[in-house]
Amino acid sequence: MSDNQSWNSSGSEEDLEPESGPPVERCGVLSKWTNYIHGWQDRWVDLKNNTLSYYKSEDETEYGCRGSICLSKAVITPHEFDECRFDISVNDSVWYIRAQDPDHRQRWIDSIEQHKSESGYGSESSLRRHGSMVSLVSGASSYSATSTSSFKKGHSLREKLAEMETFRDILCRQVDTLQKYFDACAGAVSKDELERDKVEDDEDDFLHNHPNEDYIHSNNGNKEKLFQHVTPKCIDGIDFKGEAITFKATTAGILATLSHCIELMVKREDSWQKRLDKEIEKRRRVEEAYKNAMTELKKKSHFGGPDYEEGPNSLINEEEFFDAVEAALDRQDKIELCQSEKGRSHWPPSPPSSEAHTAAGSHRLVQAPPSCPPPTDLVSSSDEHRFRIQVEDMVQNHMTYSLQDVGGDANWQLVVEEGEMKVYRREVEENGIVLDPLKATHSVKGVTGHEVCQYFWNVDVRNDWETTIENFHVVEKLSPNAIIVYQTHKRVWPASQRDVLYLSAIRVVPAASENEMDTWIVCNFSVDHDKAPLNRCVRAKINIAMICQTLVSPPEGNKEISRDNIQCKITYVANVNPGGWAPASVLRAVAKREYPKFLKRFTSYVQEKTADKPILF
């Protein structure tokens, strides 16, 4: 078969390929990752004309789409672990999509791939139709341009090439001259041979008719004279010896010039090789910098994606997780500092209460504010509710074990010590989850145990000192001193958002003797309630106690007790199961940082609030 026939046959085979129909348009509800606050949200997705668009709902399509991407250069990646999820990325834009089930996901992926294959970028037939002749021609032209330009750059090399051109002209002329000389010699020799044969024939006839040797001897001189005119000593005025010397000198000059040219080319090659090595090294550094920049850019563009948040298959490593959490906490601290300074500047000065002063006017009387329930209500035996037994057990356990000194216990580590405050921790892990019990002791002047526990338990002032809560509400009021609270904590990316459902109860434990003060305690422990089921947040489990004892130093003389004479000894214990998949090192670092800050912030708040109020024992 000829080339033309084979070409035509291959072309006909391509023409006979069945053409696929237009891609199928598809629309429906898919879950799309919006951001780390709202998470997955159902969206109406429309696929047509090589474009994927999404709307908030099917009813709002007439208001226009909320976003769209062209599928020509899109990369569709099914998720490795989540069978219902697939990602669509175009440059730095990434859509995270979840279908109802694996079959639903596969149908969407097939439809998207079909639209993509029909575009100019994804079609293989389009790549076959557009051959690579342009690149071949451009490569050939660039090669020829490089070859010619390299000879134009060296001035010495150009001069040597001119010398080679001159030597070539000289050598051609010398070859022509020598060729002419050799042709003349060849013609002369041929003519001499003919005349020599004729003379020899005449001589043979003469000797045959005159057999006398004297004639032969005398005729030899005549024969030498006969051939003198054909001697090629100087043909056409050509000096053979001179031409030979000149030819030798010309070839020697050519060889010398060639040697010089080769030397110049070797030097030039070395120079260009050094420049090439420098350019290769420069390109390597640029490519490395570009790769690092693209990696950082990709991280930033996907920073809020679901693959980079807390989870069993999170792509973020432990160090990056800690850095992100620490950066988020630092931002929150700055915001809290600005808000607290702004709030203090707007606080009105508390007017002094005339009833709260003695005749001397320098000390506060022991008087309970109207907003606080009297102690008799808090220890009333009529405190009946369904969690009463659990509350009593918790109070008894904390009074028995939480007040024990752990300073000499080898299982407890002193992690923070700032003035009167000491924070201890005992490392405990269960199934990879950090369950470290924490115990802190602190001593605060100018406040009583009742005041500290009252502000810690009272939900009306919770937002004044608690900065980690996003929102909370009382689910059920069990009794005057026991409530069930549901609260959601602020999200600290990349950690998942957490919520807590707990029972909070306040108690006063009477002193064993008249010389001792009563002990106040607030117990917060996790419970279940139908009105607060599990949701998208990670439900944490807690068992926390704030135990406060008041110490009084007698004033001099008959003076009344002032806040300068009182001191509150605080014991704070916390057993928290955070749940989720946060790294253990991150949880321990955050606990070490946040618990001391909480104690200092809360006790300072109580001191500020009670400074101008009567003492509440």
From Swiss-Prot:
A motif (FFAT) lies at residues 320-326. SMART domains: PH, START. InterPro entries: PH-like_dom_sf, PH_domain, STARD11_START, START-like_dom_sf, START_lipid-bd_dom, START_lipid_transfer. Residues 1-23, 341-382 are annotated as: Disordered. It holds the Pfam family START. One of its GO terms (molecular function) is lipid binding. It catalyses: N-hexadecanoylsphing-4-enine(in) = N-hexadecanoylsphing-4-enine(out). An N-acylsphing-4-enine binds at residues 466, 487, 524, 572. The START domain recognizes ceramide and mediates the intermembrane transfer of ceramide. This is Ceramide transfer protein. The lineage of its organism: Eukaryota, Metazoa, Chordata, Craniata, Vertebrata. The gene is cert1.
